[in-house]
């Protein structure tokens, strides 16, 4: 009965202060939905590399790079097999395959040692993990790839033809594992490489192209087993400093060179989002407190009457705490509806959706319950204490306006504004950095380039393909290369210059590459079709290489690159960002070749994109009918490097808007409370001739002062935080004064809008109403 009575009072007060109640509920709902989304995002990120059996015993062998020479995995398996297990991986991107004479393109394919399933103890749906990779030309498919390639038929024992030449037999089907830092959609036996490439390739001393994973024994201390592996490596005369990177640390570890096909998350972005979620929750709690106290003006008589009737302070506190719980539960329900409604938008903005199944687990339920309990205490105790402290005098509020309460409320709203202004500054700086990365001069023209994947079986047709393409007016230029901008650029190579070994990246290209890509030649000459016989002993080198190698008069300099062909530098190309602006410029050599080519780069007429694609497909189907026609646009491929930054940018924008909205509600609540307390004063001033704008100035100046105080605190905070954040980028924007000025203007506008409605209503109110009962 008591509980039912309290609920009736709660509903009555909700209707009585409808606007304030709705603002409280929807403010809480927005903040809770934001926190749930961030929570779901963090849970999703933390799924990576979990549920891998014995993962605490798995390490990746690293040096300065994330990949090893094939020889290392070979000697570990030969010398320590049965004690220490290891498996090498080698990735093939954009693999052209055929199934039942139908061409497909696999974005990623991994070759692995037969020990793969001993290190990674994944079960197979079909097939024997002990034998699935034991023989050359064996292949394992994920469920989704098996469905894509074979439909509902059983794929076990079926043939997949790679590059129209090599037949692989399907020996196993495994569950999709989207939450690994490397992809396992298609796993082929690494021993196949002995025939695909050349005999002995898996025992090569050089060629750092094989990420190597090691499982240490359970019954031997890890340090002893690690020393055993390192001692074995030292006997092989490798001079690099090797280390063991725990498997569970790889996803959140900083990216290192030659870390082929490894996906990384950002622990920094996670921490930022967690901090934002905490601040949003605090802002919502502060709002609720201030709006509840603002409503308390109209409830003083109710409290006084209850005290006259004998209600104890505990009874009153219980009533107000139950009201708080009602508001929070209502907000929680609305928050779930908000998330459900905006889930499709969330997927497009952040690349994820909130699934109830992902949130419901033992740990999450316990954490959520504790968080909810703390939130109820934060939002409920102070208003409950404040309301229950009213005296029995029913006509005047004695305790509500005490200076200590006013200082607390003002301090809370000041904190809200500091958070909001800081977020505005940080968001504007982040947007400026991301915009700088997207629009910076890359040193080449990434627009209007269509890329097609090719393989070794198509090399005899490349001249014909180019010749046919160039006959169409929609095609402006065609070139070939071994790599495309913005994709994985392989491992470091070493070039011998005057007896010194220097590192570089390389790209095999044809004679039309610079013109097609819009890369500028600084000095010397480019590759030319007129001297094709000499081109394989000539090289182009970038400006960074000249500086790092300290070359004087580099044109005509003789070098010995990693391809083993001594040649002459014939030209210096201006630096261009073949990788994103996250990376600093590195030495680069361009080699001319008519093999080792993997991509077609086609510059099209920007005004005729659809027609160009149609023409390209026509030629492709004529020249390369055995291979699937799949294309990509270079600008889109390049921008994929910034996928995590773009996702973070979107989330930061959304949560900043929510924080600003909540802070605005906080100002509205304090304005309502302050105006309500000064009703009599405003009435007297109006009777004495005060104009409306003077009343507005009187009521608003303290709030605007509060926003100015927030500027003073927020600006150095945001400057320091964003300077630290920008250090993560090799190329970064400047933090200009206009960002802080714009933040100040935005914050003032938001503050003015938040308080003006209440102030205007008070300023234009008939003074007779304010003084009626005085």
Regions found by a protein language model. Give the residues of each.
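Generic structural signal for small/hydrophobic residues in well-ordered secondary structure
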Residues: 14-17, 24, 45, 61, ...
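Intracellular coupling helices
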Residues: 5-23, 27, 286-327, 389-400, ...
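Membrane-proximal extracellular/periplasmic loop immediately following the first transmembrane helix
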Residues: 38-96, 205-215, 226-228, 243-253, ...
């Amino acid at each position: 009965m008591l509980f039912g009575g309290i609920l009736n009072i709660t509903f009555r007060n909700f209707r009585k202060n409808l606007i304030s109640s709705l603002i409280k509920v929807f403010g809480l709902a927005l903040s809770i939905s934001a926190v749930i989304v961030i929570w779901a995002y963090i849970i999703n990120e933390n799924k990576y590399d979990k549920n891998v059996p014995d993962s605490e015993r798995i390490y990746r062998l690293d040096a300065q790079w994330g990949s090893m020479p094939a020889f290392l995995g070979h000697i570990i398996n030969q010398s320590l097999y049965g004690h220490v297990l290891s498996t090498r991986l080698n990735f093939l991107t954009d693999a052209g395959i055929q199934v039942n004479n139908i061409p497909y393109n696999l974005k990623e394919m991994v070759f692995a040692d037969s020990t793969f399933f001993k290190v990674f103890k994944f079960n197979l749906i079909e097939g024997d993990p002990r034998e699935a990779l034991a023989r050359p030309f064996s292949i394992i498919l994920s469920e989704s790839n098996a469905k894509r390639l074979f439909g509902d038929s059983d794929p076990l024992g079926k043939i997949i033809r790679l590059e129209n030449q090599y037949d692989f037999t399907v020996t196993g089907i495994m569950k999709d594992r989207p939450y690994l830092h490397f992809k396992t959609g298609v796993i082929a036996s690494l021993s196949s490489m002995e025939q695909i490439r050349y005999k002995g390739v898996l025992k090569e001393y050089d060629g750092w192209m094989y990420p190597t994973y090691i499982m240490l024994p359970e019954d031997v201390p890890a340090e002893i087993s690690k020393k055993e592996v390192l001692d074995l490596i030292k006997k092989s005369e490798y001079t690099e400093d090797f280390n063991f990177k725990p498997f569970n640390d790889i996803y959140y570890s900083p990216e290192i060179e030659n870390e082929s096909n490894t996906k990384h998350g950002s622990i920094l972005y996670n921490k930022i989002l967690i901090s934002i979620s905490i601040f949003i929750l605090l802002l919502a709690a502060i709002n609720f407190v201030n709006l509840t106290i603002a409503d308390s003006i109209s409830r003083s008589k109710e409290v006084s009457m209850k005290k006259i009737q004998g209600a104890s302070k505990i009874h009153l506190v219980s009533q107000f705490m139950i009201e708080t719980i009602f508001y929070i539960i209502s907000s929680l329900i609305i928050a779930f509806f908000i998330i459900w409604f905006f889930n499709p938008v969330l997927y497009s903005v952040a690349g994820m959706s909130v699934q109830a199944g992902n949130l419901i687990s033992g740990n999450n339920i316990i954490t959520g319950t504790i968080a909810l309990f703390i939130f109820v205490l934060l939002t409920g105790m102070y208003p409950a204490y404040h309301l229950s402290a009213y005296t029995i005098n029913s006509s005047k509020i004695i305790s509500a306006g005490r200076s200590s309460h006013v200082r607390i409320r003002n301090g809370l709203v000041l904190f809200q504004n500091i958070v909001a202004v800081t977020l505005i500054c940080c968001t504007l700086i982040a947007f400026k950095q991301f915009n700088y990365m997207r629009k910076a001069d890359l040193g080449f023209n990434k627009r209007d380039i269509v890329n097609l994947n090719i393989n070794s079986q198509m090399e005899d047709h490349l001249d014909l393909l180019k010749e046919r393409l160039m006959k169409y007016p929609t095609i402006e230029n065609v070139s070939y290369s071994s790599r495309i901008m913005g994709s994985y650029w392989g491992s470091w190579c070493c070039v011998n210059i005057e007896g010194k070994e220097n590192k570089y990246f390389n790209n095999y290209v044809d004679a039309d590459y610079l013109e097609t890509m819009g890369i500028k030649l600084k000095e010397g000459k480019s590759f030319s079709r007129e001297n094709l016989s000499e081109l394989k002993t000539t090289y182009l080198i970038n400006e960074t290489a000249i500086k790092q190698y300290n070359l004087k008069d580099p044109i005509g300099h003789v070098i010995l690159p990693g391809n083993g062909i001594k040649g002459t530098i014939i030209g210096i190309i201006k630096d261009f960002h073949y990788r994103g602006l996250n990376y600093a410029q590195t030495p680069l050599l361009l080699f001319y070749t008519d093999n080792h080519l993997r991509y077609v780069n086609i510059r099209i007429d920007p005004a005729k994109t659809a027609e160009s694609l149609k023409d390209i497909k026509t030629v492709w189907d004529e020249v390369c009918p055995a291979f699937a026609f799949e294309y990509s646009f270079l600008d889109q491929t390049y921008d994929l490097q910034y996928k995590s930054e773009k996702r973070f940018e979107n989330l930061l924008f959304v949560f900043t808007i929510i924080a600003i909205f909540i802070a605005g509600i906080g100002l509205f609540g304090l304005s309502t409370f302050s105006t309500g307390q000064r009703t009599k004063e405003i009435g007297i001033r109006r009777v004495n001739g005060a104009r409306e704008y003077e009343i507005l100035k009187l009521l608003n100046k303290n709030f605007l002062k509060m926003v100015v105080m927030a500027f003073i605190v927020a600006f150095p905070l945001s400057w320091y935080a964003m300077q630290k954040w920008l250090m993560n980028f090799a190329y970064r924007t400047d933090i200009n004064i206009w960002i802080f000025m714009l933040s100040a203007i935005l914050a003032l506008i938001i503050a003015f809008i938040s308080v003006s409605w209440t102030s205007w209503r008070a300023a234009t109110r008939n003074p007779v109403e304010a003084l009626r009962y005085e």
